[in-house]
Structure formats: structure tokens, C-alpha cells
Amino acid sequence: MRTSKYLFSTLKETPNDAQVVSHQLMLRAGMIRPMASGLYNWLPSGIRVLEKVKNIIREEMNKSGAIEVLMPVVQPAELWQESGRWEQYGLELLRFNDRGNRDFVLGPTHEEVITDLVRREVSSYKQLPLNLYQIQTKFRDEVRPRFGVMRSREFIMKDAYSFHTTKESLQATYDVMYQTYSNIFTRLGLDFRAVQADTGSIGGSASHEFQVLASSGEDDVVFSTESDYAANIELAEAIAVGERAQPGAAMQLVDTPNAKTIAELVEQFNLPIEKTVKTLIVKGATEEQPLVALIIRGDHDLNEIKAEKLPEVASPFEFADEADIKAKIGAGVGSLGPVNLNIPVIIDRSVALMSDFGAGANIDGKHYFNINWERDVALPKIADLRNVVEGDPSPDGKGTLLIKRGIEVGHIFQLGQKYSEAMNATVQGEDGKPLVMTMGCYGIGVTRVVASAIEQHHDERGIIWPSDAIAPFTVAIVPMNMHKSESVQAYAEELYQTLLAQGVEVIFDDRKERPGVMFADMELIGVPHMVIIGEKNLENGEIEYKNRRTSEKQMIAKDQLLDFLKANVNV
């Protein structure tokens, strides 16, 4: 491709509204342009990368035995009503009417559509297992689209759905997809972790996220220093170690009128924060027990996902109103604690090991100090309630935990029969009776993969693609002062035609620009291999080569250049 014949729209300055590196560089490199909030045009360089990512995904999915289909973006409301998600889904689901006043949605996901398709096309257990996938546009009406294509309203996703007669068959396909995803992200050159995850609104039992490690990530990824253990922080098990110390001083009621937070209590009374607890009141699961107290250590954070799974806690999880707390307990939220508390109490594992700790007295402006379990208050139910912190023991007993930020680029679920049961998706079983199919689903955010690769691989000059396989071009020909030198122009043209004939994706910068501008643009868009042709070097029979990934330069003998590129460039 010649730059003179190409839509080469690079920017020197970073747009003010671009917050993260990938958004900044995708705009500057001329990969995308905004059209409206959360909506982007993809320009030629962006499309080249996007299609390469799709091709790698498609190759690995086909290799796994999955079969490609294509389903509509526009979906009839009846399917969502049938599954029960018409009422459950929030404002992210864009709903509209056609000219016949029939309800439709712009699909944020395709569980309903694929379940409907398969129940129409598959009738016998002999046709299963079946794994169908598509690469398709999705739309979620995000309240705050941000970070460019990382969290846009319209995006491209690869979503696959498998259908089975048994849980064992589902597990076998799930394992294949886990490995397939690992292969995909390895081929893309990404530093990623597959982590245990919560199933969220999709539903189901087992679930893994594939997280690209990057400081700009929105998720906390937890993994062990000495094993393969990895989990989303929502699911990572918090282990409490040690034994509870014997009680010391007697419990003491203290006036604390100006200490309504843990920070104020610690500061005013010189109390170690690990000797304090937070008493959090949440809505209970039954009318008989409308409020439940969850107690964690003062320096820990409540994990709402874990809390919601407790049978005593309402789902969806919700903190209690302060007025309800005051009416039931008689004290405000800054003065709550386990002693004489008249509602069910659940404490975190680490709290169960505490002794001589401080907590609210359930009287406004008062706290108890030197509280001890079993001496001053009965030991309540114990559960894992908190987020892990760095340095916690790994749940598998190997090493300690590290926490890094991650960007979710893939997610696989064992759905079970959530959708097939709701939508009566059955096949004839071996015994001739109707059998509800068991499902799995497997998604990759294709547009998000592109942004994630940039978040993880860039420098002050621009993008560094982690693999030649997804760079928009693999070789850049940069002829210096070509329009003033016949020898430079002739050799550049010859090299360009030769590389094209060899199947190399090459960009030939034939613009009338200063060399510095040409170098900057090629580094900005991340071309991995740059061939720099200068008149003096040509006279000496040499060509300059620069590697974008390492920034190393070297002189290559002109007659050895093609062999050098063949050995170093992935065609």
C-alpha cells in the first residue's frame, strides 16, 4: 500500500477527551474516529488490525470444531420475554418498535436467538454436542461510554454457544474452549490470565474470565506467586490464618461522639485499624429477617458478590436504608457493632480470629473497646465476606496473592439449562422422551482485544503491536528524499514490488514529507519492521533496518536484505 493512495489520517496532538492510552493512540494513529457517544468509525488502519484479530479467532475456533453462523443484530422482544430477561435487563437494552408497532431490541448478546435457532433446527440427541459461533456487532446502551472502544455502546464480539445432553459433555467442550481461548490470546501476543469468575447476569455455574494485564484495567485480577491459581477479585477466596489470642483487658464502653468512621476512630483513640471492625447492615432474604449485619475488619472491604450468595442476604444485594437501621437497632450507621445486636450477624473469617477489638456499641456516640468473642458476645456465623488483599495466602496453599489490574477480553460460562429450560429447547433423548439441552457460552470482545493490545504494548512514540500477525502492516519502506533522488526512488519501487509479490504486507511511504515525519508516523501506527533507504547508504550497498519492538537499528547489505526480512518478518 502506498501512503499517497491510502487514507493515512495520523494526528500530532492527543485529543483532550481521550483518557486512556489505547483511545489516545487509536485516534492519533488514524485507526478510529468518533461519530457519537460510544460510536466509532473504523478507518483503514484500524480495520486491518480488526480483521487480523478476527482471522486468528476464526482459525482457532474452526480448529476447535466450532461452526460459524451469523445471527441478526435486531431481535424480536418475544424471545427476551420468553427467557425472562425482558424485565430483568436494565436500560442497557435498547428497545424499539417497527412500523407495525412490534417490539424489538438491538442485541447486546445472543443467548435467546441461538436457543431459538437450535430448538428449531436440532431435534435429536444424535445431533449433539454442537458448538456454534459468530463474529457480530452488539449494542449496549452504556450510561457512560468511555475509554474509546474499550467501553463503547456498539462493539464487535465473537460469541459461541454449545448444546449438550449431559453436564459431562458440556464440561468437555468447556475445557476445549478454555484451551482455544488460551491459544487465541497467546497467538495475539497478549500477557493474560485465565481467572475464576462470577457468572453475573448471564447466569450458570462455572465461569472463567480471560484478563489482559494492564494498569488501565477496570478489574482486579488476583493470582498466586507460586502456582497457577488465578481469580477475579469478586471470586477470590480470602483465607484467614492463625489463632485467636486470649482476651486481655475487660470490655469498656467509651464515649466517641466525634468518631463516626473507622478513620476517625483510629485517629482519635490511637487504635490500630486491624483492631477495629465495620458493621454493615444489608437487606435480608426474608420478611422475618429483613436486616442482616455483616462484619468485616476495619481495613478490609466487603465483597458484595460473596455476600449476595449467602442464604440470609437478599438478592440482588442491597444495603439497608439508614432510617430502617435506626428504627430497628436504635443507632446510626457510625455506631454499630456485634454486642447486643438484635438482628442476625455474619462475620468474616478474619474477624473470627480477632480479640480485644473495637466496635460500635449500638448507641449513638459510643463504642465498645476490648471486645472478645465468646466472653463478651457469642461467636456468630462465619463466612468469607471480604475482598482479598496482596500478601494473603493463596487458597490453594501455594504462595501468596498478588493483585494486578486487568482488562476482560474473554469470558466462558457453563450456562446449564437456564435458557433452554425457560425457552423449552429440547431434543429427543435416547429413551425417546424430551430432553432439555444443557448449554455453554463463550465470548471474546474483538474490538476490546485491539484496545487491550495497545494498552499493554506501547511507548512514548506510539503503538508496539505484540505480534506481527495483528500489525496493520508488517514492513514500512521509508525512502529518504525519494523525490530528489532517482536511485532511492528506483530501489524503493523495486523493493516494494518484490515484497508485495512475496506476500508481505508492506506500506510504502511515498509522500513528499520530511524523513522525521515519516519515521514518526510509521512508529505511531506500530509497523514492526522499518526499511530506511538513503542515497549515501545505497552508494555503499547498504540499507538501514529498524525494529519497532526493540528500537534497534542495523545496517544490512543490500543484496542480503530480502533474506534478512524473510528470516525476521512473519508473512
UniProtKB/Swiss-Prot annotation:
* One function term, GO molecular function aspect: ATP binding
**Keyword Transport on entry:** no
Which terms under GO biological process does the entry name?
Answer: prolyl-tRNA aminoacylation
Q: Which UniProt keywords apply?
A: Aminoacyl-tRNA synthetase, ATP-binding, Cytoplasm, Ligase, Nucleotide-binding, Protein biosynthesis
Provide the E.C. number(s) assigned to this enzyme. 6.1.1.15
Which reactions are catalysed by this chain? tRNA(Pro) + L-proline + ATP = L-prolyl-tRNA(Pro) + AMP + diphosphate
Q: Note one Pfam family from the annotation.
A: HGTP_anticodon
Q: What is its main location?
A: cytoplasm
Q: Which residues form a coiled coil?
A: none
Concerning PROSITE patterns, the annotation shows: AA_TRNA_LIGASE_II
Q: Which is one Gene Ontology cellular component term of this protein?
A: cytosol
Where can this protein be found? Cytoplasm
Instruction: Name the enzyme's class.
Output: ligase
The UniProt entry, under InterPro entries, shows: aa-tRNA-synt_IIb, aa-tRNA-synth_II, aa-tRNA-synth_II/BPL/LPL, Anticodon-bd, Anticodon-bd_dom_sf, Pro-tRNA-ligase_IIa, Pro-tRNA-synth_IIa_bac-type, Pro-tRNA-Synthase_IIa_type1
What is the top-level taxon of the source organism? Bacteria
The entry's function note states:
Catalyzes the attachment of proline to tRNA(Pro) in a two-step reaction: proline is first activated by ATP to form Pro-AMP and then transferred to the acceptor end of tRNA(Pro). As ProRS can inadvertently accommodate and process non-cognate amino acids such as alanine and cysteine, to avoid such errors it has two additional distinct editing activities against alanine. One activity is designated as 'pretransfer' editing and involves the tRNA(Pro)-independent hydrolysis of activated Ala-AMP.
Family membership noted in the UniProt record: Belongs to the class-II aminoacyl-tRNA synthetase family. ProS type 1 subfamily.
Q: What is known of its domains?
A: Consists of three domains: the N-terminal catalytic domain, the editing domain and the C-terminal anticodon-binding domain.
Subunit structure comment from the entry: Homodimer.
Cite the NCBIfam families for this sequence. Answer: PRK09194.1, proS_fam_II
What protein is this chain from?
Proline--tRNA ligase
